A protein has these predicted regions:
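Class II aminoacyl-tRNA synthetase catalytic cores and aaRS-like
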Residues: 1-169
Length: 169
């Protein structure tokens, strides 16, 4: 029983109980557990219950595409409350178009009008229906910020911040 407590008091008490329970099973649990608020989770992972083991972070590219010839991105980049975000699926650059289209179908269930993507093939080639609209500077900035390597698949969402986070999460 606890009186006059806040969220941190409850979380700290539960951490102690969990650490003790795991300790009795021979598993050491480091404390304190990492804590993040809702907005940090959504902004970084696109989910309010992120699986942090994989390091697949959403990356904000809004500033890169503010003057893009790709109107979908330029519009979102210049609209209050909207963003251009992306996620790098490392090693997925060889996925077939059908598999990417299937992901676009899943994204549409979250309200996406589409799922923009760029596949960076192992042989150095690039496959994408949108890359023709990007300047060399935009591509260079994208590659750097997304830490793109041959074999990667970068997927984008553009529009209202929370919707874009949910689509990519």
């Amino acid at each position: 029983e606890m009186s006059f407590v806040d969220q941190n008091d409850v979380m700290s008490a539960l951490e102690e109980v969990l650490a003790d329970a795991f300790g009795r099973m021979g598993v050491e649990m480091p404390t304190p557990l990492r804590r993040m608020d809702y907005w940090e989770a959504m902004d970084t992972y696109g989910s309010d219950k992120p699986d942090t083991r994989y390091g697949m972070h959403l990356v904000d590219l809004t500033d890169i595409f503010a003057n893009s010839k790709f109107k979908v991105f330029a519009t979102a980049a210049n609209e209050e409350g909207s963003v251009v975000k992306a996620i790098n699926a490392k090693g997925a650059g060889a996925w077939a178009r059908a598999k990417i289209d299937k992901l676009a179908g899943v994204a549409s269930t979250f309200g996406a009008k589409g799922l923009a993507w760029i596949a960076f093939r192992e042989d150095g080639s690039i496959n994408s229906p949108i890359v023709k609209f990007f300047s060399d500077e935009e591509m260079a900035a994208l590659r750097e910020r997304m830490d793109v390597e041959p074999g990667d698949l970068v997927m984008f969402a553009a529009g209202p911040r929370l919707l874009s986070d949910e689509i990519l999460g």
